[in-house]
C-alpha cells in the first residue's frame, strides 16, 4: 500500500477494501463482540488457581458423583483435630466424704494412731473418785455470770467456761476475771478450744493429755 493510499485512508478518502496492510487481517475476528464484554485477561484465572494445594481434585470429583460433601482438611489454626471438650465439667465428690457427719463424728470415729487413747483410760478420767469426775461446764451469756464461775471454782470444782455464745468484748473481760481468780487461788487456767477454757483448783492436776482429750472429745458440749 502506497503512502498516498495510507493518507487517503487516514482521512477517510479511500475505500476500506483498499486499506490493506499488516495491521488488518481478513482472518481476524469481526468488529462485533464475539466474547462477553467484560471478559479480559483476568478471566483466564480459573477457580483451580486458588484451590487449596492440600485438596485432591479427584476426591472432590468422587464426592460430587456420590452426592457427598467433599472432605476438606481442617483449618490451619486447628491442625491436629483436637476433640471438643466441655468447658464446665461437674466435679465428682467422694460420696464417703459427703456421707460423713459434720457434727459428733468424734464419737463414732475414735482417734487412731499416736493420738489414740485407751477407752478404759478415757472412762477413768471421769469416773467417780477422779478429780475430773465432778467437772462442770458453764456457758455464760454475759459478764454478770462471772460470780457463778467464781463460786464453783472456790468450792474446788473444775470449771469449763464455754464462751462461744458471748460477744468478744464480754468474753475478754470474763477471761481476765478467770485468769485472776485462778492465780489468786493457786489454781490453773488453760485454753481447751476456741473460746473454751478450763479452770482447775489447786488440788486438781489436769495433765496436758487430759486437756487435749477434753478438747478432742468435746466433753464440755454434753454437760
Curated annotation (Swiss-Prot):
Q: Which HAMAP family match?
A: SepF
Family classification: Belongs to the SepF family.
Task: Briefly state the protein's biological role.
Answer: Cell division protein that is part of the divisome complex and is recruited early to the Z-ring. Probably stimulates Z-ring formation, perhaps through the cross-linking of FtsZ protofilaments. Its function overlaps with FtsA.
Primary localisation category: cytoplasm
Which PANTHER family did the record assign? CELL DIVISION PROTEIN SEPF
Query: Which key words are in the record?
Result: Cell cycle, Cell division, Cytoplasm, Septation
Report the protein name in the record. Answer: Cell division protein SepF
Instruction: Fetch the Gene3D superfamilies from UniProt.
Output: SepF-like protein
Composition bias, Basic and acidic residues: 36-69
Q: Which InterPro entries match?
A: Cell_div_SepF, Cell_div_SepF/SepF-rel, SepF-like_sf
Question: Which proteins does it associate with, and in what oligomeric form?
Answer: Homodimer. Interacts with FtsZ.
Indicate yes or no for the key word Cytoplasm.
Answer: yes
Enumerate the residue ranges of region (Disordered).
19-81
* A Pfam family it matches: SepF
* A cellular-component GO term for this protein: cytoplasm
Give its localization. Cytoplasm
GO biological processes:
division septum assembly; FtsZ-dependent cytokinesis
Amino acid at each position: 500500500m502506497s503512502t498516498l493510499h495510507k493518507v487517503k485512508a487516514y482521512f477517510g478518502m479511500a475505500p476500506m477494501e483498499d486499506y490493506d496492510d499488516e495491521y488488518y487481517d481478513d482472518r481476524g475476528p469481526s468488529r462485533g463482540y464475539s466474547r462477553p464484554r467484560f471478559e479480559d485477561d483476568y478471566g483466564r484465572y480459573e477457580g483451580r488457581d486458588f484451590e487449596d494445594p492440600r485438596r485432591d481434585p479427584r476426591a472432590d470429583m468422587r464426592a460430587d458423583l456420590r452426592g457427598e460433601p467433599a472432605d476438606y482438611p481442617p483449618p490451619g489454626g486447628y491442625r491436629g483435630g483436637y476433640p471438643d471438650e466441655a468447658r464446665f465439667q461437674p466435679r465428682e465428690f467422694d460420696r464417703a466424704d459427703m456421707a460423713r457427719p459434720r457434727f459428733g463424728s468424734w464419737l463414732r470415729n475414735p482417734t487412731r494412731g499416736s493420738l489414740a487413747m485407751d477407752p478404759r483410760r478415757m472412762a477413768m478420767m471421769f469416773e467417780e473418785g477422779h478429780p475430773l469426775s465432778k467437772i462442770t461446764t458453764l456457758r455464760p451469756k454475759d459478764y454478770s455470770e462471772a460470780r457463778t464461775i467464781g463460786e464453783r471454782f472456790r468450792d474446788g470444782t473444775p470449771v469449763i467456761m464455754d464462751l462461744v455464745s458471748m460477744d468478744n468484748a464480754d468474753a475478754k473481760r470474763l477471761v481476765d476475771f478467770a485468769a485472776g481468780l485462778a492465780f489468786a487461788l493457786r489454781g490453773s487456767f488453760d485454753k481447751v478450744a476456741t473460746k473454751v477454757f478450763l479452770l482447775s483448783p489447786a488440788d486438781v492436776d489436769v495433765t496436758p493429755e487430759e486437756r487435749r482429750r477434753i478438747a478432742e472429745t468435746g466433753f464440755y458440749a454434753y454437760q
